[in-house]
Amino acid sequence: MRMKHPWNAGWWFRPGKAEDAFLSDDWIGPSAAHSPKNKTIISKEISQTDDAKNKTEDWKQIHLPHDMIEAPFNAFDERSFLRWGCYAKELKKEEILKITEGLDKKTSINRYPAIFLSFEGVSVSCRVWVNGRLACSHKGPYTPFEIRIDTFIPHTWLEEQSKEQGSKAERARPIWVLVEVDSAEDSGIPPFGGVVDYLAYGGIYRGVSLCADLGARMSKLWAIPRPRGDALDGPWLVHISAEIEALESGSINNCSLLARLYLSGELVNEGNILLSDSTRIEEKNKFSANFSMSVDRPKLWDIDSPALYDLELALFSEMGQELDYEQLRIGFRTAEFGSSGFYLNQRRIFLRGLDRHQEYPYIGYAMGPDGQRRDAEILKEELGCIIVRTSHYPQSPHFLDACDELGLLVFEELPGWQHIGGREWQEQALHDLEDMIVRDRNHPSIVLWGVRINESKDNHEFYARTNELARRLDPYRQTGGVRCQARSELLEDVYTFNDFIYDGKGTMYISEPAKVLPKYRKRAPYLITEHTGHMFPTKRFDQEERLVEHALRHAHILDTAMGNSRVAGCIGWCAFDYHTHKDFGSGDRICYHG
């Protein structure tokens, strides 16, 4: 059974790159340096030099999420964000015992647990050391990654009865996790390589979790509800898929996967599959399990009544012992863009919305769950949005969870802004796209995948690959790709277009779709994904006349779009003001486009 706990408190941080003193397996760590009784120990065990002493004493204790530099509100030099930083946290035996106490040791051949660290987001790239050994490197500020760390830890340290095993020095030695973060705008990592009108800041700006498993574990869990016929008030099928991997020697052929579906705590249905009936992956002790369960007349997920079901997935051994457990939230709904608009549960809805950056004053990206939820509440309840576009990258899982709960639709897109890099850059973009879809495809709020780099030029080979990947990973959602040019090659299902034709003069508020769409796809679904924004920047403290004009521009454009049956929706730029580079904004490093 999987045990998972937040691992966000009690970290240490210092500016600069990782130095050799930190990468040794006998490093005492920054917490020891800040204890007065350990000052002498440190000077003896590390070095007598002031330089080595400073290497441990210039750390400060922090909690995650964290940004490496506290940003001024405005008028800063964005180059100050381009820096190195190190995070360190001691892995304590009590924490391991706590997360493993619920594991049934009888289910495992190996008595030691498999221990994982899961990072939700680190900007921009990082390397992770465990016990002085390099465990992982990761590129990209917006996608999660996971590391198995027990292989870097002595078994005698992991053993519960370690007082009787191993040398005294080995048992007493602390185990440190060190994360070196590089927030440079690396031209090999999307969205960088060209000019970008927003910042990525730097640091471990999302949460970290400590997980433990015994025997086997599930990954890439996905459940997609589909109606069995045209009627939505009849039977549905929930298609469930998962990858299951053995964590130790021994076969998992005879294991079974059980699924239970609940609504408001009441069991709706259950189903199971034997791994022996599943597909083995690449001759490894790994399986791809796929099965379905039926649900009669489910309560639909909708923008006004977002009903969420809990799906529990449990992996059992041949003897009936639980090896792993996960829980998903899913919603029963249909969503489709067509030539006459967008349809949710077969009902046409005009998609009124705004784009959103995930940043905040002073703390950059490092906002916790409550702040993420508050943004969703503002969009849905105060601004009247039906949809939000996650411009221009995958955003916080907490924000997406709130969208599920509030009934706020989401158009989520891969990282990027105008620039398409070379082969290595494109491979990283595809990797980001895959991570985004695998992470988020269980969210009922997401109705469209963005598979083009925002406002980039056509690139047939690259965008053929992004579309193919998205459709393979999720054949049930349509694809879109935000462009700013008319007659662009359309490889996606929906033509998503940034329309800034209105400059405050005349009555040409939006472009006519027939003049924008390629001639060979004149009836393609059509969605406006940006308008207004930089065409009329407005500060909250501007004079009333400008504030009114700003509101009227949004109103004119929305009114015109709603009156055109070919337009599925109209998403404005943007929900909130945001920090930018010197090339953009109002000269003080802020884009007042919210």
What role is predicted for each listed range?
Residues P65-K93, R111-F119, S123-V130, C136, ...:
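Active-site-adjacent substrate/metal-binding segments within catalytic domains
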Residues D20-D26, D186-Y198, M319-Q327:
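Beta-sandwich strand segments
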Residues H5, W12-G16, L82-K220, L247, ...:
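Accessory beta-strand-rich segments of carbohydrate-active enzymes
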Residues P154-H155, K168-A172, S241-F337:
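Extended acidic/polar, glycine-enriched regions
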Residues P113-I115, G234-A242:
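Structural beta-strand segments of beta-rich domains
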Residues E381, I387-G594:
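Substrate-binding/catalytic cleft of secreted carbohydrate-active enzymes
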Residues M1-P72, E180, A184, A551, ...:
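Accessory carbohydrate-binding/adhesion or oligomerization-edge regions at the termini
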